[in-house]
Design a protein with these regions (language model features):
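Active-site metal-binding motif and surrounding structural segment of the metallo-beta-lactamase
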Residues: 46-47, 51-91
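Conserved beta-strand hairpin/beta-sheet module of binuclear metal-dependent hydrolase folds
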Residues: 1-62
């Protein structure tokens, strides 16, 4: 089983627009984080946990070619707003 953390930030992402804290001003790649999502891969199956606004970017960065299931943890926008971008997986 492979677990990939696609995003680990808050609902605003990091860096946060207009924020001048050390993390948001940092040039270290670890301080540039997408919104929360996890991909679980096992025996050719891909299960995605949450589909936030960074979904498209997360799929492209990680070269995900298919999704078999999606688990939505709750209905806040930072966990579901990327649903429209799932369409290419159905073609």
């Amino acid at each position: 089983m492979q677990i990939t953390f696609l995003g680990t930030s808050t609902s605003q992402g990091v860096p946060v627009i207009g924020c001048e804290c050390d993390s948001c001003l940092s040039h270290d790649p670890k301080d540039n984080r997408l919104r929360s999502s996890v991909l679980i891969s096992e025996k050719g199956y891909n299960i995605l946990i949450d589909v936030g606004p960074d979904f498209r970017q997360q799929m492209l960065i990680n070269k995900v070619k298919k999704l078999d299931a999606i688990l939505l943890t709750h209905e806040h926008n930072d966990h579901i707003i990327g649903m429209d971008d799932i369409r290419p997986f159905n073609f």
